[in-house]
């Protein structure tokens, strides 16, 4: 089944956002379109932007005036950016970053008032959950590049990414309990990224943790000085982009598939995946290149 079909079935300013340089803006029909139901007026700027270069797509949360709140419009725009050409061999890795001093403050509380109604509230949370599932089930790795606060659903977004790199000035919180809205959906991703007692302390108190604490508990992959954030994130992205897309894609899918299984089932599934990997053109190319003491030439073909 095509990757997009599978995905759909699951129903810091300046250099920190990688928007400068020779990044190729995605087609206007993609970048400027308003996802169905997003509720954004045509005159309003798109809440995310996306550019792609050398197999690396950078998606930027672009509403710093509202602390990059994950409004319904923002979520649908982010979903569109993530799903765009997911099956293309030209796409090797995705980076999600943000403009301004806040990565994301979480849901837009103005959308969660009584006036909006239960159906609208359900759409907000269901759309957010779909975005997180799209990240998990996407055929390429997704990297969060964090410079600043990631709170509530913003913290959920970081926890949902495959890799997360943050500046040492960043912090992470699930503070919904302080305004009477427990961070139940952020808790799903958080509980799968950090130990249970750490997750529950964050959820029960709403108190933030530092980048170093987040690294210690497994929410982050790396913490670097702010000046080195883009360089280190791009180093990781370029390394992934230099590898075989189908091999990496199979590896990602297999990793998450085996994760909830018992030990025996996990080894059975991964053994089958290793056999499938060897049947890939790039699987044989890599081994042949190693034996011939040369660099592999990846085809990036799925068979």
UniProtKB/Swiss-Prot annotation:
Subcellular location: Mitochondrion
N6-succinyllysine carried by residues: 110
Principal location: mitochondrion
Keyword Lipid metabolism assigned: yes
GO terms under biological process: fatty acid metabolic process; positive regulation of cellular response to insulin stimulus
Known role: May play a role in fatty acid biosynthesis and insulin sensitivity.
Expressed in which tissues: Expressed in adipocytes. Expressed in blood cells, with higher expression in patients with low coronary lesions.
Alphabetic keyword roster: Fatty acid metabolism, Lipid metabolism, Mitochondrion, Transit peptide
Presequence extent in this chain: 1-17
Protein name per UniProt: Enoyl-CoA hydratase domain-containing protein 3, mitochondrial
Lineage, broadest ranks: Eukaryota, Metazoa, Chordata, Craniata, Vertebrata
Gene Ontology cellular-component annotations: mitochondrion
Matching Pfam families: ECH_1
InterPro entries: ClpP/crotonase-like_dom_sf, Enoyl-CoA_hydra/iso, Enoyl-CoA_hydra_C, Mitochondrial_ECH-domain
Coiled-coil region: none
Gene coding for it: ECHDC3
One Gene Ontology term of the molecular function aspect: hydro-lyase activity
Protein family per UniProt: Belongs to the enoyl-CoA hydratase/isomerase family.
Keyword hit for Lipid metabolism: yes
Top-level taxon: Eukaryota
């Amino acid at each position: 089944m095509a990757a997009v079909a599978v995905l759909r079935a699951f129903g810091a300013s300046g250099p920190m956002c990688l928007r400068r340089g020779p990044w190729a803006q995605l087609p206007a029909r993609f970048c400027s379109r308003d996802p169905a139901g997003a509720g954004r007026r045509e005159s309003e700027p798109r809440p995310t932007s996306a550019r792609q270069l050398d197999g690396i797509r950078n998606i930027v949360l672009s509403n710093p005036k509202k602390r990059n709140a994950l409004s319904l419009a923002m979520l649908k725009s982010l979903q569109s950016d993530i799903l765009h050409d997911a099956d293309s061999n030209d796409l090797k890795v995705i980076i999600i970053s943000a403009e301004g001093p806040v990565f994301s403050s979480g849901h837009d509380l103005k959308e969660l008032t009584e006036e909006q109604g239960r159906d609208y509230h359900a759409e907000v949370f269901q759309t957010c959950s779909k975005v997180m599932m799209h990240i998990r089930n996407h055929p390429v790795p997704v990297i969060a590049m964090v410079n600043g606060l990631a709170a509530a659903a913003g913290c959920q977004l970081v926890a949902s990414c495959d890799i997360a790199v943050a500046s040492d000035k960043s912090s992470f919180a699930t503070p919904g309990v302080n305004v009477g809205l427990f961070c139940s959906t952020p808790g799903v991703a958080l509980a799968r990224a950090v130990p249970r007692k750490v997750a529950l302390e964050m959820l029960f108190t709403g108190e933030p943790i530092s980048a170093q604490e987040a690294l210690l508990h497994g929410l982050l992959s790396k913490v670097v000085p702010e000046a080195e954030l883009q360089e280190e994130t791009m180093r990781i992205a370029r390394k992934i982009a230099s590898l075989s897309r189908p091999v990496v894609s199979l590896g990602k899918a297999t990793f998450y598939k085996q994760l909830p299984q018992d030990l025996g089932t996990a080894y059975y599934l991964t053994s089958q995946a290793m056999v499938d990997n060897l049947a890939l053109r790039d699987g044989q190319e890599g081994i042949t290149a190693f034996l011939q003491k040369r660099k592999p030439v990846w085809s990036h073909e799925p068979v």
